[in-house]
Amino acid sequence: MKKKSLKLTALFLALSCFPAFAEQTVDIEVQGIRGFRAVRNTDLNVNLINKEEMDGSERYQHLVTKAVDRGLRVFGYYESSVRFERKQRQGKRDLLIAHVTPGEPTKIAGTDVQIEGEAAQDENFNALRKNLPKDGVLVEHQTYDDYKTAISRLALNRGYFDGNFKISRLEISPETHQAWWRMLFDSGVRYHYGNITFSHSQIRDDYLNNILNIKSGDPYLMNNLSDLTSDFPSSNWFSSVLVQPNVNHKSKTVDVEIILYPRKKNAMELGVGFSTDGGVHGQIGWTKPWINSRGHSLRSNLYLSAPKQTLEATYRMPLLKNPLNYYYDFAVGWEGEKENDTNTRVLTLSALRYWNNAHGWQYFGGLRMRYDSFTQADITDKTLLLYPTVGFTRTRLRGGSFATWGDVQKITFDLSKRIWLSESSFIKVQASSAWVRTYAENHRVVARAEIGYLHTKGIEKIPPTLRFFAGGDRSVRGYGYKKIAPKNRNGKLVGGSRLLTTSLEYQYQVYPNWWAATFADSGLAADNYTAKELRYGTGVGVRWASPVGAIKFDIATPIRDKDNSKNIQFYIGLGTEI
């Protein structure tokens, strides 16, 4: 019997070691703290307390006091106090209110941040030191930690791989409510690039070296390596690039291996589309991204539609000095067009030199030769032209295939003279500018303008493709494609020597990827710039930001047309809007 009694006692003692299942009996509310971040951080710490502890007891109040202290310390409040008040609520758990008195805040009394080693002369570190907090601001632990991280990250980005903090302290004086930053960072020496090698490349090393933005002996900079992953693919010679740096602590150098994966030797592109101006059209492109070890390439394109057909092949020769930005293009092409009162066949040859600069501008200059056989209105002729051409372009786009921001600038200058065996003399200048901007996400504005000037003694000797016509999509909507131009006595289109078109379009997003549009266009294709030659059109439309680009549908009509035209024109198109 005694043994049985002892067993029961032992069982009772064992069970008593485990607390009964606790239950939340109060809700907590913290009051008296100002500042969104301080409130959020304090609430976060309080909410980390297990719900089973929320019974309103002194133990729970102690846990809340500690949580409040942790939440406020990081913002410079080291002497906070908490007074608790418990309120009963009918039909709800009691409410425990924590009345917090943060106390006097601790403020920064001084910052002592020193840089030793080669980084002491580095302007980037000096710039970082200018961002220290000013005396008198509240001390925040996160600001201190972020600054330390910024120094460490900058050191790694700029090649100070041996850098370390000899001193890093946040000193607090609760009695005086003051704080001091103490940091001493020893950067050591800055590493430099060592051997730079290429692997798997089909292009000669001397061409690749002139694409590099670094050379052996240059100071290390991580951004340089990031640029390489975009520079080499932009040549179209490679499908992908892998940059592998190897840090050598003994020699204080960084060897770089650039692994290049060549593109396939042949690439084909097929496309089918529809537009009101050209109807159904198809396109076939064939490209050889690289032909030899000097990076020469060939691209060809065939375009077919009812009114227009083109075939063009271009041979590109990059220059050794700067293969990405300096190159020659040699092109041969054929074009046929039968539209309105135009029937033309053209054979073209060109040799152009291109220069690309760091600001996005592309300049070109060279020679063009063309043989035209054409009928325009009632005149049939053949002509051979040889003329120099120069120009420049710039394209800036953001937002993918349906740009939210961007602009395109173009200008060309052509000069033909009989003195160099060209059958017609002329001067032609043509410039265009297009802009797209998005405001407050839902408001989009597209603006375009184009001007052209052709000086010649006899426009009938100039091929139709060099004359000016207006009307249609991307010109003056409300009119048919190339229907605006001077006419002869028989009412047939001749083409003009002056061109001016403008367009302003407003779009509003009515649904994700869907935009309603309204627009007004104006322009002329004439023999002089006069107000009476201007044509106006206005309309409305819909835009769909599809994965392959903008698909649009427009309805437009002329305004105050001098021929009293009231025709309504419909436009359907696919592609970039500028």
UniProtKB/Swiss-Prot annotation:
Residues 1-22 form the signal peptide. GO terms for cellular component: cell outer membrane; TAM protein secretion complex. It comes from the Bacteria. The chain crosses the membrane at residues 265-276, 279-288, 297-306, 309-317, 327-336, 347-356, 361-370, 387-395, 406-415, 428-437, 444-453, 500-508, 514-523, 536-545, 549-557, 569-578. It is found in: Cell outer membrane. GO terms for biological process: protein secretion. Keywords: Cell outer membrane, Membrane, Signal, Transmembrane, Transmembrane beta strand. Belongs to the TamA family. Component of the translocation and assembly module (TAM), which facilitates the insertion and assembly of specific beta-barrel proteins into the outer membrane. Interacts with TamB to form the translocation and assembly module (TAM). This is Translocation and assembly module subunit TamA. It comes from Haemophilus influenzae (strain ATCC 51907 / DSM 11121 / KW20 / Rd). The gene is tama.
